[in-house]
Regions:
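Glycoside hydrolase catalytic-domain context in secreted enzymes
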Residues: 1-622, 626, 640-644, 649, ...
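Generic surface-pattern signal
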Residues: 8, 12, 24, 264, ...
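Terminal connector regions
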Residues: 621-668
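Charged, amphipathic alpha-helical linkers/stalks
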Residues: 649, 655-726
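Long, charged, low-complexity terminal extensions
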Residues: 702-759
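C-terminal non-catalytic accessory extensions
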Residues: 739-811
């Protein structure tokens, strides 16, 4: 071990206490051993360091920081170099604020568009997610801070996220949900990984030996620290034994006592603890040493201004032009434009929850119009942000549209639509916005829509627009970038990192999401996003990888060799611009079922008008592989592969073939037993087929019997105790009230969906697991549990004081 000399000088009590947090954001320090505390902070798109009382939900204010476009937007740039620059800026702001570990990026695969936190994640594709995450991590860690890849793994719904079991087959786990993390670890060099709240195949992620030990540490060679999501620890001892390093936030010393008892009983060994202590020491001592050598800026305001410019550049490169009929964009200087939409006054530029940033400043369309070069007839809100109809506002907007040449309509999802802790109920934008679109289109045929939405929306109204610019959640400097695109100063170059479907019912996981019981069944398998839509022939509004430009690009001269594909790319239009060339690979007639094509490489290429470049996209170890569940290893199926170069997954410009020698000797499936998967008819997968790819029977996910430690508080609806049912009812009423007000109550949402054990994990040591056991007895109708709660309280206080005293005496 790297720090054996320090470990030898630590008592077992010190080592046990070291492996859980000291406070909401800090690790425990030991001055006598020169072990300082380090500070963690949320920050996938901006540093959220709370100056006062800490919370993990973004409720209390944080110090000012630059709010960059969210991961959903950055992924649309397909620009690894730009993502790395953003990572550097986030790392710099972390170091300026004495943040040692930045809790990002988020690599969750966008399995289903209803997930309330999709704005925080990159893509439906693991390869793109992994490449962008690796760039982010390299940038952050180049400054001396540590990045934290999250949430590991298979975490795709907010509903009961702490009490949900993801039932997923090994092939899908490897190919879809872990590949991005593999790239982030191997190519990005992430120093920390955050374990997710949920169970994976019946074992909580934070204590899952298969995930943490077999794959993360043994296969990928990860030597860093695994940090729990806040309150995600279930069995702290098993977590430590199986590869989890640090439990956060502070569970008090109950967690430390749990480790001591487990060593005494033989459940774990002191060696298990020493290994985790060594990992955490490396993180603590390395990042604090880096902080000593980091030279802080003399003028933080100047640094923030520099980063504001970078945030604007990031938006410029990630906005996606979905539609541009009649070349209506860019807007000419003499064209009189009506600017309509509440988002033009107050931009919707970030999501809610733990990633919410206290921005250094926020640009708005309204404030920047004067210098935009766009001639404006007027600017009005047009609709109420909370979704309420307002006829006076609508009439004002329609009148303005009628006397203008074009309409610039700013719209999309409001704040309550996208937030941590709450999944969306549908994919529609607010109805009052749809009604206004219809009225505006009657008044003016030249409609240009600017969409702010961190995740997929249905677009039954898109035919009303001649042009659509999708900005996702564009960060604090997005307004200037958008106006530069609309006026033609900037040529849009973003492409979609997720498929924009026609209707939610087309989603492959539609029948299984979100899970209303304990199990979340991933029956769709590897057919996530475009992998399904392409294979099943389901029409979509805008496909994965799609995005227009003000110029045009020509692909030619494809040459495929064993190590990659080379082709020429020419800008045939009048504007300078960037094209994102995409490499897809498929195997016609494959014996092992697979999507018709999968992304295996990409490159963003800038070309001046008329310029031509030779482009090469290399193959790598992931180009032809699949996971064989029978041999339990990566294999290659032999055959003649289609090598496709496209402007999107639906726009293949060049194609050739390449014969590959396979490694498969044992087939993973009998084709006749998985016909729905072979044909891509995922929404009709039956139990027998699902069990075939799982390799075992479907576990029982129904709720029954008395409530236990890992049942969510919302399940008190079924409790025997009338008091418990009353509390559950009140929590539900509180949520409905906040929803009606348009302001999600994140704290209540967290409580509603958290399991009983989290009461001990999230109360800073005030509540012990013994007390929760007593509380559960009460909930289950046994009022004798009240005595256990009371006696447990006093026992917990006494034991905590004694433990603190023992630690103090070591000083």
């Amino acid at each position: 071990m790297k720090y054996q000399n320090i470990i030898d000088n630590m008592t077992l009590k010190e080592k046990a206490a070291f492996l859980s947090g000291k406070s909401e954001w800090q690790t425990r320090d030991f001055p006598r051993l020169d072990i300082p505390a380090i500070f963690c902070s949320d920050g996938p798109n901006g540093v959220r360091k709370q100056a006062g009382a800490g919370d993990h939900l973004g409720i209390n204010p944080a110090v000012p920081a630059t709010c960059f476009p969210t991961a959903a937007a950055m992924a649309n740039s397909w620009d690894e170099e730009l993502e790395q620059r953003v990572g550097v800026a986030l790392g710099e702001e972390s170091m300026e604020e004495d943040v040692n570990v930045l809790l990002g990026p988020g690599l969750n695969i966008k399995r289903n568009p209803l997930c309330g936190r999709n704005f925080e994640y990159f893509s439906e594709d693991p390869y793109l997610s992994g490449k962008m995450a690796a760039a982010f991590i390299r940038g952050v860690q180049s400054t001396g801070a540590a990045a934290c890849a999250k949430h590991f793994a298979v975490n795709s719904q907010e509903l009961r996220r702490m009490a949900m079991n993801a039932v997923v087959d090994e092939r899908t786990l490897r190919e879809i949900y872990l590949t991005g993390f593999e790239i982030a670890i191997k190519e990005g060099g992430a120093k920390t990984v955050m374990s997710s709240y949920n169970e994976v195949n019946g074992v909580y992620a934070n204590e899952n030996e298969h995930l943490l030990k077999d794959i993360l540490r043994d296969e990928w060679g990860f030597e860093g620290s695994v940090i729990t999501d806040w309150g995600a620890s279930n069995d702290h001892s098993l977590g430590v034994k199986n590869g989890s390093t640090l439990e956060m936030p502070t569970p008090g010393l109950d967690a430390a006592r749990e480790l001591l008892a487990s060593v005494e009983s033989g459940k774990i060994s002191e060696k298990d603890i020493d290994e985790r202590v060594d990992e955490l020491l490396d993180l603590v001592l390395t990042t604090t040493e880096n902080a000593k050598h980091y030279k802080k800026v003399a003028d933080k305001k100047a640094l923030h201004e520099e980063h504001h410019k970078l945030a604007r550049l990031a938006c410029e490169n990630s906005a996606v032009l979905l539609k541009n009929e009649d070349g209506i964009l860019p807007v000419g200087a003499k064209v009189q434009a009506a600017v309509i939409g509440d988002f033009a006054f107050d931009p919707r530029y970030q999501g809610a929850g733990s990633s919410m940033v206290n921005s250094t400043k926020v640009d708005s369309i309204k404030d920047m119009l004067e210098t935009s070069g766009i001639s404006v007839t007027g600017i009005v809100r047009g609709y109420q942000r909370d979704g309420k109809e307002d006829e006076a506002m609508k009439k004002e907007a329609v009148d303005l549209a009628r006397r203008s040449d074009v309409v610039l309509f700013f719209f999309g999802l409001n704040e309550k639509s996208e937030t941590e802790g709450l999944d969306r109920k549908h994919l529609r934008i607010p109805q009052n916005q749809i009604n206004l679109i219809q009225e505006l289109a009657k008044a003016n045929a030249n409609m240009i829509g600017i969409i702010s939405a961190g995740s997929v929306i249905e677009m039954p109204w898109h035919h009303h627009f001649k042009a659509l610019l999708h900005t996702a959640l564009m960060g604090q400097a997005g307004a200037g970038a958008v106006l530069d695109i609309l006026s033609g100063k900037v040529n849009p170059s973003g492409k979609l990192a997720e498929t924009y479907i026609k209707k939610y019912e087309d989603t492959p996981s539609y029948n299984y999401y979100p899970s209303q019981e304990r199990n979340s069944e991933y029956r769709e398998g590897i057919y996530v996003g475009y992998r399904y839509f392409d294979t099943a022939g389901v029409p979509v509004n805008y496909p994965f990888g799609y995005g227009l430009s003000y110029t045009t690009f020509e692909y030619d001269n494809l040459q495929v060799k064993p190590d990659g594909a080379t082709f020429t790319l020419r800008n045939t239009g009048k504007y300078d611009g960037a094209e994102i060339a995409q490499l897809y690979v498929g195997l016609p007639g494959a014996k092992v079922f697979r999507p018709v094509k999968e992304l295996k490489g990409f490159l963003k290429v800038f070309l001046k008008a008329g310029e031509e470049k030779t482009v090469t996209i290399k193959f790598d170890d992931k180009t032809f592989r699949y996971w064989n569940m029978k041999t339990n290893k990566w294999e290659v199926e032999g055959g003649v592969y289609s090598i496709m170069i496209g402007a999107s997954c639906a726009d293949i410009r060049l194609q050739d073939s390449l014969a590959i020698i396979g490694t498969t000797e044992v087939m993973p499936y009998y084709t006749n037993r998985v016909s729905s998967y072979v044909e891509g008819k995922i929404q009709q997968v039956g139990n027998e087929e699902y069990e075939t790819i799982l390799g075992h029977s479907i576990p029982d996910g129904s709720w029954s019997g008395e409530l236990g430690m890992n049942d969510a508080l919302c399940q008190m609806y079924y409790a025997k105790s009338g008091i418990a049912r009353f509390i559950c009812k009140k929590l539900g009423e509180k949520l409905k009230k906040s929803e009606a007000a348009g302001i999600p109550d994140l704290n209540t949402l967290f409580q509603y969906n958290m399991p009983f054990r989290a009461i001990a994990k999230m109360t800073g040591g005030m509540v012990s697991m013994e007390m929760v056991e007593g509380l559960l007895k009460v909930v289950n109708g046994h009022f004798s549990g009240l005595g256990k709660v009371i006696s447990g309280f006093f026992r917990n206080q006494k034991l905590n004081k004694q433990y603190e005293k023992d630690l103090e005496e070591q000083k």
